[in-house]
């Protein structure tokens, strides 16, 4: 059956545009508008068929008919574009209403925690010594007795080696312990680095202490070691005075009291002037220090006739207690975020 000829008259094209405009205007959703577009602007729409029929016209009529078809398509397309913009605006307005945030509602955000003050103090100590030209050094927390005791001049019968003071690692005879101080880093540094050496080590240490107001079985130490030609106790004193002022302010002062440590000779206890001491200011024990024992230097292959050195060690928990007036060390280890919040450093 032969196809019906397409009507290309002005009236037929006007009817096609009018039908398309009505269909677009009646579409209430974007899906309905898409269907109307297919029907009135698609490949089988009246306007598309009119364009296809241009080829069957005489050449003398094609130009005029083509202009009229293009005008019709432009008008229909304009109707579609206007309705599309209107429906999209309606959709966006509905989304804004549905997803709007009620700023008057109480917040459901979890409160921000705070970094632990020991972490903050450790970074502050590291910054202090790095600013003086020192380097950072680290060592393992599970240490051999060779580095924890032997190389530091502890005699075989020293009480610190016993299970009453030190955590020994199974099996028996492994000669491994949880390090009781950060001093093993001294030996490792002297064996691994070329002289001169100026290093600071900050880390956890372990002892079989009961947890109470002034002791904890896991605590943090800062250990300093300097080995160079011509170092004396005066250099040690100047270094610790600078350290004290950095932590306690201009009022920070130190004094030395003679003491004994296996790995330093001469040795001293370091006291810090504690202006916040209950009952008034006074001297409080801060840590230990001294000149590196020649036996320790020899164990690391260093000639003590050529090089000398000094070392010192302080507990970070003890330093925090003095500096911030914290009466009970247990607050530092119980994990209550309320303890950290007053220090004012967000996570």
Swiss-Prot record:
GO terms for cellular component: cytoplasm. Its EC number is 6.1.1.20. It comes from the Bacteria. Its cofactor is Mg(2+). One of its GO terms (molecular function) is ATP binding. Mg(2+) binds at residue 265. This is Phenylalanine--tRNA ligase alpha subunit. It catalyses: tRNA(Phe) + L-phenylalanine + ATP = L-phenylalanyl-tRNA(Phe) + AMP + diphosphate + H(+). It holds the Pfam family tRNA-synt_2d. The keyword Glycoprotein does not apply. Belongs to the class-II aminoacyl-tRNA synthetase family. Phe-tRNA synthetase alpha subunit type 1 subfamily. Binds 2 magnesium ions per tetramer. Tetramer of two alpha and two beta subunits. It is an enzyme of class 6 (ligase). It comes from Mycolicibacterium vanbaalenii (strain DSM 7251 / JCM 13017 / BCRC 16820 / KCTC 9966 / NRRL B-24157 / PYR-1) (Mycobacterium vanbaalenii). One of its GO terms (biological process) is phenylalanyl-tRNA aminoacylation. It is found in: Cytoplasm. Keywords: Aminoacyl-tRNA synthetase, ATP-binding, Cytoplasm, Ligase, Magnesium, Metal-binding, Nucleotide-binding, Protein biosynthesis. The gene is pheS.
């Amino acid at each position: 059956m032969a196809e019906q000829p397409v009507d290309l008259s002005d009236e037929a094209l006007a009817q096609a545009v009018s039908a398309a405009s009505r269909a677009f205007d009646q579409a209430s959703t974007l899906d309905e508008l898409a269907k109307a577009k297919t029907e009135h602007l698609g490949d089988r729409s009246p306007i598309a068929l009119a364009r296809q029929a241009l080829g069957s016209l005489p050449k003398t009529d094609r130009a005029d008919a083509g202009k009229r078809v293009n005008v019709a398509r432009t008008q229909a397309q304009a109707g579609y574009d206007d309705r599309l913009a209107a429906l999209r605006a309606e959709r966006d307005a509905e989304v804004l209403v549905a997803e709007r945030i009620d700023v008057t509602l109480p917040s459901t955000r979890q409160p921000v925690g705070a970094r632990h003050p020991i972490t903050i103090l450790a970074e502050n100590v590291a910054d202090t010594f790095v600013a003086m030209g020192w380097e950072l050094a680290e060592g393992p927390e599970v240490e051999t007795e060779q580095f924890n005791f032997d190389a530091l001049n502890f005699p075989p019968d020293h009480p610190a080696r016993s299970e009453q003071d030190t955590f020994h690692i199974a099996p028996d005879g492994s000669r491994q312990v949880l390090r009781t101080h950060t001093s093993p880093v001294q030996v490792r540094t002297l064996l691994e680095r070329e002289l001169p050496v100026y290093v600071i080590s900050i880390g956890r240490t372990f002892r079989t202490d009961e947890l109470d107001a002034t002791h904890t079985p896991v605590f943090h130490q800062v250990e300093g070691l300097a080995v160079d030609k011509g170092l004396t106790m005066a250099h040690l004193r100047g270094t610790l005075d600078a350290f004290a002022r950095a932590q306690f302010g201009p009022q920070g002062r130190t004094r030395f009291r003679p003491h004994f440590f296996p790995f330093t000779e001469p040795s001293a206890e370091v006291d810090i002037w504690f202006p916040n001491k209950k009952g008034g200011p006074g001297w409080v024990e801060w840590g230990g220090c001294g000149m590196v024992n020649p036996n320790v230097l020899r164990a690391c292959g260093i000639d003590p006739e050529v090089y000398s050195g000094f070392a010192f060690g302080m507990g970070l928990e003890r330093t925090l207690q003095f500096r911030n007036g914290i009466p009970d060390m247990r607050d530092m280890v119980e994990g209550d975020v309320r303890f950290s919040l007053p220090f004012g450093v967000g996570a």
